[in-house]
Amino acid sequence: MDYSMLVVVLMALPLVASLLMAALPSKSVPRGLYEAIHLASLAGVLVLSLFLTAQVVTSGEAVNAIGLWFHLDALGSVFVALIGCIGFLTGFYSLAYIRHDVEIGHMSPSQVKQYYVFFSLFVFTMLVVALSNNIIMMWVGIEATTLSTVFLVGAYSTKLSLEAAWKYVIVCTAGVAFGLYGTVLVYANAADVMADAHQAVFWTSLLPYASQFDVVLMQIAFVFAAIRLGPTAGLSPLHPSPPDSPPLPHSPLPSASPP
């Protein structure tokens, strides 16, 4: 069996679902069709992620796809399985949640379409990050997860949801340049050490030369990467307040008191 093709199919499922739902007119297409496409793609991602995880863990062999651009090893399979499981569970739960909001008039057909389109796109971007063997593509995938999440946060198009989406953008993109600079530092150092500089963008090509990298330069790259990923991952002291926190300033006393 060609497991590399299954890796491509795994990433393609949510992307195709997102593009398909985006192409459908929200006014004339019943909500049930969006729900069917949404759930079918997530079920496919769940099955393939668990199957590939079991294959990699039992065989002990990693799977490459599209040359060296995508790579699934034992560690990556854990994240892929988590994305598949959590994506399916949250996607299944959101069906009833969205239906309820439609019934009480909180969401319009176009907003329902927006939610399902960007939910699938978000799953796709997370899979790209977990499977990418290219350090630049991984950085692009991380930024893409932020952009797709913004439209999910602001799906209701209310004042509070749009404000929360704006806060999320500010918090998560404040360190975009730091993350890119840290990635470029890793590539630049690897290109100097490796005989073939074209291979310096692939994680699997970097690992054998890791002991030859400049320690100080790698520490600087780590700091820049931490500045970028800290707000997204919620790492202290870079973790932000929740994006839906109250927009009005608190009085000094409650703000200074412990939670």
Protein language model features and the residues they cover:
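Structural signature of hydrophobic alpha-helical transmembrane segments
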Residues: 2-14, 74-85, 135-148, 216-229
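Internal transmembrane alpha-helices of multipass membrane proteins
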Residues: 40-43, 65-67, 72-177, 248-253, ...
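Hydrophobic membrane-targeting signal helices
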Residues: 12, 16, 20, 47, ...
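Juxtamembrane/interfacial segments at transmembrane-helix boundaries in multi-pass membrane proteins
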Residues: 56-69, 102-108, 178-251, 259
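Helix-loop junctions at the membrane-solvent interface of multi-pass transporters
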Residues: 23-24, 55, 97, 131-132, ...
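Transmembrane helix-loop-helix hairpins at membrane boundaries of multipass inner-membrane proteins
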Residues: 1-9, 16-117, 197, 204, ...
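Short hydrophobic/aromatic segments of transmembrane alpha-helices and their interfaces
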Residues: 1-2, 12-13, 58-62, 118-121, ...
